[in-house]
Amino acid sequence: MAIFNLKKREIECKIVYYGPGRGGKTTNLEYIFKKYSKQITGEMVSINTEGDRTLFFDFLPMGLGKIKGCDIKVQLYTVPGQVQYSATRKLVLRGVDGIVFVADSLEVRREKNMMSLKDLQKNLKEYGLNIFKVPLVLQYNKRDLADEGIPLMSIEQMEKDLNRQLKAPAFPGSATKGTGVGDTLKECIQMTLKALQKELQWAK
């Protein structure tokens, strides 16, 4: 749930990058941190867990105007994808306003993607949130690895596995090269702000 800071005239939204372990969530955030450094306030905080990390930092989206005369600040988080960090993932989702689900395009990761999406749905439900109503964007990461002859799933296959019911916006990407990273983030921020404006109108 977005936080209103009336003193600073600021609205803070929280966007979480979710998905299977080693799928590219951290790489997405690291790319954003480097590429959009002028729009970032403060440092990137990294909490190391064995074989994975939880990252977060504040991002100021430019050119998106104001809501109710307030500036917008977005907090970007990743969650550790490994199965054993279920409690951490659930904790990071608390108060979430928008989600980027980073799916791994490698053929061998097909099951992991589907399990992670189910895990997301379950954790959201425990907070009283519906995966079909939360602003959600999918990114099909590691598309560049096809050039190296590594077997990838087709976009059609990934859409069928993950997005047949959700019908969420989806972007092919390569987080290491930055392909699709900005588009994914921009779409998620816009969807999140639209949902927030709707919420505020209901609250009048």
Functional labels for PLM-detected ranges:
Residues 22, 82, 106-108, 142-146, ...:
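Conserved nucleotide-binding/hydrolysis micro-motifs of P-loop NTPases
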Residues 105-165:
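Conserved C-terminal guanine-recognition region of P-loop GTPase G domains, centered on the G4
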Residues 86-108:
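Inter-motif core of Ras-like GTPase G domains
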Residues 76-78, 100-104, 137-141, 172:
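Conserved beta-strand segments of the P-loop GTPase G domain that flank and frequently precede/overlap
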Residues 8, 52-55, 65-70, 91-95, ...:
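Conserved catalytic network of the ASCE P-loop NTPase/AAA+ motor domain
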Residues 144-202:
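Canonical P-loop GTPase G-domain recognition
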Residues 2-48:
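Conserved G1/Walker A P-loop phosphate-binding module
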